[in-house]
């Protein structure tokens, strides 16, 4: 799953690197995110998520098993993100900066992805199967479910990226 997530990330980075700064900063309407803000949201969501998982892993004791409830909540979450609806970002992953720095976000995303890889390598399967991650809406999920969430979350926002770039006022190359 790490490989698939990395391929997805590389696809987004290739796309963004091909765009001009004015295209990355284009907002389709007032109070709507531009491409930089979409990327900021994705990177922030992963940073906050990994920080929470690391905090849970430090306590080690009292981490519950991820049971059928986690499975069902994850299924609902993945289904919701595949639907053509738009959701307001949870406060923890809100984007306040209108023009986040692209290079900084690339660096942060590299770092958080290395952190995910390290987490997986340094944890045994029994630990990774526990409810380590708290999604703001879906509740507690295990590491595999967290990775699945990242994948569908990014795919959800890739649709948003395409909508922004198809906007009639999107700057020409």
Q: Where are the model-predicted features located?
A:
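Carboxylate-rich helix-loop segments that flank metal/cofactor sites and access channels
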Residues: 64-93
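Short, contiguous alpha-helical
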Residues: 28-75, 126-173
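Structural signal for well-ordered, non-membrane alpha-helices
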Residues: 9-17, 47-50, 54, 113-121, ...
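Extreme N-terminal tail/first-helix region
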Residues: 1-11
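Internal catalytic-core helix/loop-beta-alpha segment
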Residues: 95, 99-111
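Acidic interhelical loop/turn segments
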Residues: 17-29, 89-100, 118-146
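Hydrophobic packing residues in well-ordered alpha-helices of helical domains and bundles
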Residues: 5, 35, 105-109, 147-150
């Amino acid at each position: 799953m790490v490989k698939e997530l990395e391929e997805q990330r590389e696809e987004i980075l290739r796309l963004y690197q091909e765009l001009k700064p004015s295209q990355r900063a284009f907002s389709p309407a007032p109070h709507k995110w531009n491409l930089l803000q979409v990327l900021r949201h994705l990177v922030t969501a992963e940073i906050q998520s990994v920080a929470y998982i690391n905090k849970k892993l430090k306590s080690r004791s009292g981490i519950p098993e991820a049971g059928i409830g986690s499975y069902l909540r994850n299924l609902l979450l993945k289904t919701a993100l595949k639907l053509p609806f738009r959701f307001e970002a949870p406060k923890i992953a809100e984007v306040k900066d209108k023009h986040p720095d692209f290079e900084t976000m690339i660096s942060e995303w590299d770092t958080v992805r290395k952190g995910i890889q390290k987490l997986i390598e340094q944890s045994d399967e029994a630990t990774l199967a526990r409810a380590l991650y708290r999604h703001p809406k879906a509740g507690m999920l295990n590491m595999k479910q967290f990775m699945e969430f990242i994948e569908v979350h990014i795919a959800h926002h890739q649709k948003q990226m395409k909508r922004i770039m198809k906007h009639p006022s999107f700057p020409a190359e």
